[in-house]
Amino acid sequence: MKRTKTIVTKLLLLTTTAGLLFSCGNGGRSETLSETTLAIETETVQETTELEARQAIPDELPERDFAGYEYRILTYSPTAYEVEELTGDVVEDAKYDRNLKIGERFNVTIRAVPSPGIKELDKELKQSVISGDNAYDIAIPHQITSGPGFITSQSILTWNDVPYVNPDKPWWNQTINETINILGQQYYMAGYVTMPTPFCMFVNKAMLADQGFDDMYHTVREGKWTIDKLIEMTATVSGDLNGDGKMDSADRWGISFNNDNNTLNFMYACGILSVLIEEGRPVPNTNNDRMIAFIEKLYELYHNGNRSLVTTYQNQGELGMGGFKDARILIKCGSVSDLAQLREAEIDVGVSPYPKWDEAQERYATHVDAWNGMLCIPKTADNLERTGIVMEAMAAETYKYVIPAYYDVALGTKYVRDTESMEMLDIIFASVVYDFGYIFDSWNGCTWTAPNLMTRKSTNVASYWQSIEKKVTSHYDKLYAAVEEDIAQRAE
């Protein structure tokens, strides 16, 4: 959609005003200054806004009538995919309008079937496939809990042969096609439709200025936000506030993160994936010089200099977020969803991506938590054209309308306090990566090299890899064999 804008110059405004004054001052004469001395032209300009350009991208879907079909999505986050009525909340109303528009276009009703939890969803889908009841068109499982198991149990189809799903469209994550496949088989898809909440960092801007680092946003823009810079910034912040001679959660810290996914995300931010795909086969990316150098650098941040308050996954809210809100922590690692917790905070909060490994690294990178599920197709799905068309439409409409509402209206007006942080969010959302190992590792240790070694206060990558190599190799051999079997069966 293009907006036509007529540009009227200040000179024209001045001329009109002068003409009115001239008319009034000459006994009601109708002649104006513009009529006698000036010829003013207006210029019509076609201007397309970023939002209009986004919404103008065609989904290239055919017209179909699915005769009132109920399109069922199995999920533990039902409100992301179905909203029953308009509520006045801009994001929820955008989801409602999305489904209504798709429903009218294709004569379908979109239904989110809620599961009480991640394990229950895993069990429900597998049982549904075994019974052959075709209960669901799409399932959105927890990445780690169900990622490999749905493949080895042959519970899902691949997206490769689903018509009308175009992974090159901007509403799909562009890295997942390269990193989450085996022998070219794409069992999972992800994009804006799953409402990702990537990991990021929150910064106390007043503390930052006190430390002499008051232009962090410029550092990010220039590509100079690196792990070395983070170590430098957090080196002199910590202090024993209560004077008890020890550093604990009541004191001042340079940075805080949990010993779980916050720690793991440093690896992704530094451009490292735990598993690579070579000739269609998963190959662990653990015991090498790059990982060793990263682990040594992370150890410095983690354990040296009393700069880091490391929490558990369970107490990160109380200790990490609590200390950040109380202005005792310079930088807090978290995810974009944590912005809601900071809405009423009295400190001046900024947002930034995780740091890169070095300035030579081309782009910033971040991951999403496993709770940001991925899309898969139950093996019992009986109409792949319908499956593809409706999901492609949902992905496209989410990208065009729901995400702008969430991003610009909800984040921009409710949570983010400065334009620079919105700029940082642009960088963060554009840098989401998916790691084969994170999804398919099944807690076997390959992906969690960094958190596990940091917990053990060790940098001995070789020893760690030796302790898990047999288990990891066996795990991926079984996964690879399951895909080979699936390909063979479909070829029969």
List the predicted regions and their residue ranges:
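Short, polar/charged alpha-helical segment
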Residues: V83-N107, A206
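C-terminal motif of bacterial Sec signal peptides marking the signal peptidase cleavage site
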Residues: L20-S23
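Glycine-centered hinge/linker elements that transmit conformational signals in sensory
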Residues: I231-A235, F266-M267, I272-Q314
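Hinge/lid segment of periplasmic solute-binding proteins
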Residues: L51-Y71, Y76, P116-K119, Q143-C200
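Conserved C-terminal helix/tail region of periplasmic/extracytoplasmic solute-binding proteins
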Residues: K379-G388, T398-E492
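Pocket-flanking alpha-helical
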Residues: Y81, K119-I156, P170-M189, D228, ...
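Periplasmic solute-binding protein
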Residues: I151-Q154, N173-H218, F257-E279, D369-P378
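Extracytoplasmic/periplasmic substrate-recognition and gating elements
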Residues: R343-L411
